[in-house]
Amino acid sequence: MKLHKFENIARFPLFFQLIHRIGGGIFVGSETPRLPCRFRLEKLGKQVYSTSVLFANDKEWGSYPEMIAASDISMRFGQQTLFENVSVKFNTGCRYGLIGANGSGKSTFMKILSGQQVPTTGSISIDKDCRLGYLKQNHFDYEDVPILDVVYMGNEELWKIHQEREYLYSKVDLTEQEEERANDIESLFADAGGYTMEADAAKLLIGLGIPEEKHLQPLSALTGGFKLRVLLAQALFYNPDILLLDEPTNHLDMNSIDWLCNVLKNHRGTVVVISHNRYFLNEVCTHIADLDYQEIRLFTGNYDDFMTANAIALENIRRENQKKESRIAELKEFINRFGANASKARQATSRQKELDKIELQEIKPSSRVSPYIRFNPRNRLGEKVFEANGVSKRYDHTLFENFSAVIGSNEKVAIIGTNGVGKTTMLKLLLKLLEPCDGTVNHGETVELSYFPQDAGEILNLEDHAIDWLARFAPEEGLSEQELRSFMGKMLFSGDEVHKPVQVLSGGEKARLIIAKMMLEAGNVLALDEPTNHLDLESIEALNYALTLFPNTVLFVSHDREFIRSLATRIIEIDDGKVTDYPGTLAEYEDFKRRRARGR
């Protein structure tokens, strides 16, 4: 029997279609398997073959052992327990999405894995000689450091060699001892990949949207979001065996997310990633590590696979419990009816024994809670909503010019493009929150806007308490405190949380408070600028569903491909000063761009 091993299976989709046809249904449809795999093909006779596939999570996959393991990990902060006695293994060749509700302890667990935090109990073991890298958040430590050097620092060994090499070569005269050391350093520099370090670092930075002309500038020359991209390049530059990434897609545009997906899918080691981007989790992950019930459970497959499997498992438990409850009722009725009957005593005793053995399977309360979001417009919306005529906007350079468009009712319009091209500016121009340099913007007479800004500070008063700030947007007749509490409860503010000062709210809480404001306003046109940035997966899905149900116009900026794909009926893309207005979904628009690139 001959064993064929494919390191990059994504290159062989047609091959796997063929194997599906001759292999008796190994795969669903013609889908390329997501896991690293080995394919066995055995010839049994003339034109007769036996096929089988080993995936990286199969027991027979002997050469892909665990790389990092957590044993009996518990984490407590005072009376709060985040997780208890967690034991989990992360294997080579697998990419794990660590998911869970906000506050469940995902980032804490990632810090424990990386050695940045000590657990209350338990230990972390890493295979000998494995290199571990993680995404740092300390960009303030590198403000005056050239961007390329920040990336180089991801490989500590190479960085030290590089520094010593630079020092020796900067000296005019070298002693004999220094010359010998310089020769040794040159050899070490070559072995560590020093001759390609600049090209390797530049490739990472360009892939993350940082142009070459910026690479020698200090990190302080970049805005906050781009600084975090440099730290992501730093983690990737090390090319570690184990890569731990906490929210790597934050501040990335769609092109950079696609680039990162490809990098991680080609990573041969172990990846553990936290993300609230469903597209990213579906594209990258071979497994989901679900942090819930103060424990971590592993599922094979991506995020959608996990959601399906989890829903089926819960439904199966409910159905099984219903059957058991029905049987319990039957047994109790018989026992109560015939328990005192001498002729039925043996049967009653038998049924009592059966009853004693029946146990209902516990359905634990999940830490995941979804907010209830619904946007119900108070007044009717006319056909005309937005009209832009010859709109241009310039700062130190031209963002776009001579843009004209008419946006009608019932349209859901996504404004997309790479970071810095002017998406937020375009949105604010259409909302009349900014004045154009040229041209005009008009609103329909019936338009009543409700707005979610990218920067919560634009509308939140940090001195207010949450409930007091929200009360300002109540209908004219007002709402009682109890009614406001009930309303905020739908957005997951409970008890004394409604009186939290706005300034201490988390990013997710601020986002939910602004969404609550939009619900109270009952506007007939909704505008949202990066609404998913600070929301957890459950809140994103709840918002996504509510906007899908909304009967009127939605205008939004987003980098979340799944959010755009499921919602947008029209795409406005800004690319290097050019605006494309496409009347269709994201999938249709991307197909249009591919055909246009091929000249069709």
Q: Residue locations for each model-derived region?
A:
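Acidic, Ala/Val/Gly-enriched low-complexity intrinsically disordered segments
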Residues: 7-10, 28-31, 42, 48, ...
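Generic short N-terminal amphipathic or hydrophobic helices
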Residues: 8, 18-21, 25
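ABC ATP-binding cassette signature C-motif
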Residues: 49-321, 375-600
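Proline-centered turn/helix-capping motifs that create local helix->coil transitions or kinks
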Residues: 196, 343-347, 357-367, 442, ...
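ABC ATPase nucleotide-binding domains
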Residues: 317-331, 335-337, 344-353, 369, ...
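Short, flexible cytosolic linker that couples an ABC transmembrane/permease module to its adjacent nucleotide-binding
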Residues: 362-380
